[in-house]
Amino acid sequence: DVISLNVPDVVKVYGIFESTNTNDAACPSINMGSMDGPNSNTSDLIIGERFVGQSSGAVGIYLTRNSDISIGFVYLNNSIFEPEEIVKFKDSNVTAIVTLVNSGSPNITNDFKFKTGQNSAFYGISNITRKADIDPPSRRLKVYYARGTYDTNDTGDITTVNSYGG
């Protein structure tokens, strides 16, 4: 029922995906061409940035760099990216043409509740809990999330109770 994410400071779960076979689960992905950034590949993009399909209106958030031409993402609306459409990345300002759209594994995010691990007495590990009326997953899961981190080489950070919103 409860799956630990094994880390604190998770602020958002972007997606939970269940594999359809014995392989690892995967988020949706797109292949792109004609990227107009300095390196003309996905190294010009910023993980976590939003991007929009100019004809479909689909909005995604970039999660993983799969290769020089492919990224993994999650949809932020109900529209779907289309082959041959132009996508515009908001932070890097890169545009590209979608050449292939892969739907990825089934997104079962709505089958779970997310808990940050924060409570009034202590700050614990983040987790997801399966909703009571949902059958347990039978295949591998992959959870994509955003979390706060600190650079261990940075000697200037101080964290207090006011550092966390809640």
Where are the language model's segments positioned?
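Short, surface-exposed secondary-structure boundary micro-motifs
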Residues: 56, 92-93
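Glycine-anchored, exposed beta-strand/edge motif detector
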Residues: 89-92, 99-101
